């Protein structure tokens, strides 16, 4: 009987530990952000990331008229010069979902004059 009692105690301790873990573990969930909020991806959104905390795995949704704009993921140099290099990923659906990588993620509109007019954002994800 003593042996059965030890098994019950171990099961109880294991149950308590599992309950503790369930209630004290932090679950990392990605957050979905719509770039530009209600206005979408358009001129004047370059300051949109300010004050927000982004994490790797969060998703940016770019909503825009695909007949007018696009979204291009570029490196820092392309962001500064408003140039999409060959091999840059171009999105043009008007409802694009892009998952953030750790570090700074740069996006521009490659329609002539749009990036130069301020249609670009830099988003840093921890």
Curated annotation (Swiss-Prot):
The keyword Nucleotide-binding does not apply. It comes from the Eukaryota. The keyword Disulfide bond applies. GO terms for molecular function: electron transfer activity; metal ion binding. Strongly expressed in stigma and style and to a lesser extent in leaves, ovary and petals. Not detected in pollen tubes, mature anthers or roots. Cu cation binds at residues 69, 109, 114. Residues 1-30 form the signal peptide. GO terms for cellular component: plasma membrane. Keywords: Copper, Disulfide bond, Metal-binding, Signal. Disulfide bonds join 82-115. Induction: Activity enhanced in the presence of stigma/stylar Cys-rich adhesin (SCA). Pfam families: Cu_bind_like. Residues 31-126 form the Phytocyanin domain. PANTHER family: BLUE COPPER PROTEIN, PUTATIVE, EXPRESSED-RELATED. Diffusible chemotropic factor that induces pollen tube chemotropism. This is Chemocyanin. The lineage of its organism: Eukaryota, Viridiplantae, Streptophyta, Embryophyta, Tracheophyta.
């Amino acid at each position: 009987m003593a042996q059965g009692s030890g098994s019950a105690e171990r099961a109880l301790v294991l149950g308590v530990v599992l309950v503790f873990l369930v209630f004290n573990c932090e679950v990392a969930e990605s957050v979905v952000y719509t770039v530009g909020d209600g206005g979408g991806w358009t001129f004047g959104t370059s300051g949109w990331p300010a004050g927000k905390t982004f994490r790797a795995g969060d998703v940016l949704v770019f909503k825009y008229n695909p007949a007018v704009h696009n979204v291009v993921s570029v490196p820092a140099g392309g962001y500064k010069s408003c140039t999409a290099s060959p091999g840059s990923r171009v999105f043009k659906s008007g409802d694009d979902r892009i998952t953030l990588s750790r570090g700074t993620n740069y996006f521009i509109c490659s329609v002539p004059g749009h990036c130069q007019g301020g249609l670009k954002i830099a988003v840093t994800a921890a």
